[in-house]
């Protein structure tokens, strides 16, 4: 029993610590990439090429004074960042990085992840209410409505994948896509693939769906009153969710750790590449897409975001799920 606890604790640390480092340097990559897209250099002063910038940013945040608004609900004000941070990292417990390399290989892994990603909204809403600020509350209300709207579309997209794969376990979904790139679901479930990733951008409150913290309207939304380490927790949760959406998109639609050269003449050449390398390469593509979209599109109005979710994404995914269910039931379609 003690050995199991120690092993589990070690595995958790092996996931959380590298993930926090990836989050830190993801912020650096974001500033660099968007800087180049805008014909700027980006951070280049702290360390060679600015590589130490994330470390000093973290030190700055964690050494700052924690200011609590006078009329805020002190206890909920402190709990809210933890409620946002914990689910964002707990969801990684069921993510398989390669065959057998997973903390908990659950049969209902996708359901667990959906629950964890939905639970993080409580931290945002509580932060907005407990801060006793109208701007924080407006941001929290927007976040609640936005997450509910796009969670439904994401849920339908996941249902389509589950029907096609015949499994709610993440490992089962990856194995169902083995056999080469033509077996990956981004081809047969292309509308669900597009909707899932765009809904993931909206769910993480990233541009162009960042009305939750629209600087020109409500200053900084739900974390306007947060400073220091409490603000850092929200920051870490947001970027961890971005990476989670990226890796889930890779797993559900791009075959996870499966090589794109399976069942081809190139399989013998690339057969030595570990599955985790393919998974991280695919994840990196979607992480870059988050940054590219932010640098390209202006912020949508709130009514446009709601219309996109309720009038386009939800009906589209619902209809496609029905089509997929009928095709699977009748034995028709590209599920080899």
UniProtKB/Swiss-Prot annotation:
GO CC, alphabetical = plasma membrane
Family annotation (PROSITE patterns): COMPLEX1_ND1_1, COMPLEX1_ND1_2
* Membrane topology category: Multi-pass membrane protein
Q: Where in the cell is it found?
A: Cell inner membrane
What keywords does the record list, in alphabetical order? Cell inner membrane, Cell membrane, Membrane, NAD, Quinone, Translocase, Transmembrane, Transmembrane helix, Ubiquinone
Which biological process terms from the Gene Ontology are attached to this UniProt entry? aerobic respiration
Kindly list the residue ranges recorded as spanning the membrane: 4-24, 75-95, 108-128, 154-174, 181-201, 233-253, 272-292, 308-328
Q: So what does this thing catalyse?
A: a quinone + NADH + 5 H(+)(in) = a quinol + NAD(+) + 4 H(+)(out)
EC top class, in one word?
translocase
Entry-linked Pfam families: NADHdh
GO MF assignments: NADH dehydrogenase activity; oxidoreductase activity, acting on NAD(P)H, quinone or similar compound as acceptor; quinone binding
Q: Name the EC number(s).
A: 7.1.1.-
Database matches in HAMAP family = NDH1_NuoH
PANTHER family in UniProt: NADH DEHYDROGENASE SUBUNIT 1 (PTHR11432), NADH-UBIQUINONE OXIDOREDUCTASE CHAIN 1 (PTHR11432:SF3)
Give the quaternary structure. Answer: NDH-1 is composed of 14 different subunits. Subunits NuoA, H, J, K, L, M, N constitute the membrane sector of the complex.
Which family, according to the similarity comment? Belongs to the complex I subunit 1 family.
Described purpose of this protein according to its UniProt entry:
NDH-1 shuttles electrons from NADH, via FMN and iron-sulfur (Fe-S) centers, to quinones in the respiratory chain. The immediate electron acceptor for the enzyme in this species is believed to be ubiquinone. Couples the redox reaction to proton translocation (for every two electrons transferred, four hydrogen ions are translocated across the cytoplasmic membrane), and thus conserves the redox energy in a proton gradient. This subunit may bind ubiquinone.
Q: What is this protein called?
A: NADH-quinone oxidoreductase subunit H
Species name: Francisella tularensis subsp. mediasiatica (strain FSC147)
